[in-house]
Amino acid sequence: MTEHCASDISDVSCPPRGRVIVGVVLGLAGTGALIGGLWAWIAPPIHAVVGLTRTGERGHDYLGNESEHFFVAPCLMLGLLTVLAVTASVLAWQLRQHRGPGMVIGLAIGLMICAATAAAVGALLVWMRYGALNFDAVPLSYDHKVAHVIQAPPVFFAHGLLQVAATVLWPAGIAALVYAVLAAANGRDDLGGRLCSR
């Protein structure tokens, strides 16, 4: 009976590990465009006013708590990427025969490409919707001293290299953490993977 079961398990065929990992990377890269589109749809724009003072100087200010959207919009992007990272890690863990460091590397690369794609698509879509705002170019006159303007939401907290890198690396770190927790919770040395015929 044991010999019969062992032969059945070894006869299970599965796709090559490299092909599956490349599929995960490409799938996550494509998902980045969807994440960027969703972010551009839900990210709140920033409403501001531009006006002339009595001395003729130009100034601007944000309405109410609109300046908080400089923080809220990038947090939305990180939140969407975090949800995707957790979901992708759990789904990748379900591919039992491909569990291991190769899958973690594939997840990390795919999620970094996904984050970069989401940021690029999101920035492009909000730029197409709201345009680039230059406070000094808003037309004002002494008859119309105040103008209401809308500024596109930012994708990143700042445009420094560190902030951009943190946003791109964030989902890869979350995915690695979730995958590590799943691996640590598994009591088997082979991570519970099934044997496949290659």
From Swiss-Prot:
Main location: membrane
GO CC annotations on file: plasma membrane
Record bears the keyword Cell membrane: yes
Residue ranges of the TM segments: 20-40, 70-90, 107-127, 164-184
Bilayer disposition of the protein: Multi-pass membrane protein
Subcellular location: Cell membrane
UniProt keyword annotations, A-Z: Cell membrane, Membrane, Transmembrane, Transmembrane helix
Keyword Transport recorded: no
InterPro entries the record matches: DUF2567 (IPR021213)
Stored Pfam families: DUF2567
Family label: To M.tuberculosis Rv1591.
Protein name: Uncharacterized protein ML1222
